[in-house]
Amino acid sequence: MRQFKTESKKLLDLMINSIYTNKEIFLRELISNASDAVDKLNFKSLQDSSVKLDQGDLAIRVSFDKDARTITISDNGIGMTAEELERNLGTIAHSGSEEFKTENAEQQGSDVDIIGQFGVGFYSAFMVASHVKVVSRAYGEDAAHVWESDGLEGYTIEDGERAEHGTDVILTLRENEKLDAEGEAETYDRFLTEWGLKSLIQQYSNYVRYPIQMMVSKSRQKPKPEDAGDDYKPEYEDYQELETINSMTPIWKKRSSDVEKKDYDEFYKSTFHDFDDPARTISFHAEGTLEYDALLFVPGRAPFDLYSKDYEKGLSLYSSNVLIMEKCDDLLPDYYNFVRGVVDSADVTLNISRETLQQNRQLKAIAKRVEKKITADLEDMRDNDREAYEKFFENFGRGLKYGIYSSYGMKADELADLLLFWSAKEQKMITLAEYAKGMPEDQKAIYYAAGDSRERLAKMPVVKGVIDRGYDVLLLTQDVDEFTFQAMREYVAADMPKIYEDDAAREAAEKAVADGAEPEVEDRHLELKNVATGDLDLATDDEKKEAEDATKENEDLFSAMKEALGDKVEKVAVSARLTDAPACITTEGPLSLEMEKVLQKGPEGAPDGMPKSQRVLELNAKHPVFAKLVAAQKAGDADKIKQYSGLLYDQALLVEGILPEDPVAFAAAVCDLM
């Protein structure tokens, strides 16, 4: 019995129990080792003309014996001598593949794809096996050797027999564990089924470059006997056939010009279990200090759980065609969590188990490039296939908005131009850039209204007042919309026609254009303004003076109405924004009525201490109701002022989509007036 090199027992125990968290990856590791062995022989044949190989014969085979509880992984690669068995398997964390890559770094090309790095993958076999036997015959050698170990005390190396060069790794699986206190147990029998092994091969090693073959069970109809009568019923028999389990050539490594759309669509649907074709396919290859391939998909519809806390984002990460992580969330920002796809790079730094990535600049560089590619593709769809983009935005636009809000506006530069909102004027979805292009020259802000439906918002007096002045209003109907705009604070509209300070400058610019010069443009910083919040400063000087005069003349009335309404409002004032409606509720400060409603709709309602919107009851001094209020004040009719104040406040709330605090009292007051 030979002892493992290094602190073998402790290190091997650490390997089995700590480094790997998922026992099923043992097959991935052993298949990767087999692939490396075949690659080494392939490389040898390229360097040495005396080594004759038929490329079609290079393969890896996986088999199992349920009764003997064994799994065998075989290859016809370069094999190992007794000394190499001692060095590679007797020394934990010595990587023959890494040594090979180092020694032949300058000579390797695209024909060689060595996977191993750390020299520990082989020992993952002991997570599932109580005994491991390795039979290997090195290429060009007559003798074979057998390495055996139970993973505890040590190992033996003896002479053996093998018909040709290559290696067999034979695992004797552990017995199933008994149920623990939590009712859980490891069932190793799951690895002793055809379906179980095929599933693991296709999940982790589907794109290993050499065929991975298995004998699989099939059924076929027996030949019909010549003397069979009319009542003959077909008979079937089971048989076994050698089948290649893996796809070998990953579709993401092919040039996109060589792949048809239907092939991308089929790969997407089968890999990501979707019934619909993807809306967009993005394929690219990056070269330089960091080389990788990426194949990304924008789904045609949102998964049902996209906005649930259980949804997991991430791209499948491969290294040299071997699956490392099924969902690497570091490769996607949260606002692109809907994107599915694959990134494959031999250059990323893995941890020793290859189950996870080490956080490093390489990963960040890939993620940054992936994000840029997604953004560019979405911009292309927005500009060249608007119908498809609007459908995409209906599915995934909420996440883009949340990306701006959750970053406190830091991502606005990247995402703002991808957003769509309903235009009250154009009666369609438009971008912020399109809104800006359609603004009158004197407009200095982007106006919006927020609520639960476009139909209700379009009828609001404050919206109608802005539209009547010739300005468009964006109608925001998702909960996150106004929070997004508050995080942005402003939108920088690029390439806007330059506004000149005086007529002389304007005339000079117009003359230059007439003489063939390009029109001057500028970036314009546009504030995002809620039409129901604060002072929009849209009134003319005459309208402002009328409002000021009405306010001064009726200070006692407004004081009486404020007293009647109590802390429901901050103040009562004359409005310069209303045209037809008798009253409206606006707010001062950062919290609008709609934002207050959204916060109150949380799972536990409005949190204690949450600030309330600072409501202002604005009155239309030109409306007949205002004249009645003035008359009541002059007559000293405090009861009528109180009744009118409550009615106007409650009806203004209804216009905002908010029920009165006391609907019964509101209905009674209306009936009383009737």
Task: State where each predicted segment sits.
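GHKL (Bergerat-fold) ATPase N-terminal catalytic module, capturing the glycine-rich phosphate-binding loop
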Residues: 1-187, 191, 199, 222, ...
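GHKL/Bergerat-fold ATPase module in large chromosome/replication-associated machines
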Residues: 114, 132-154, 174-179, 183-674
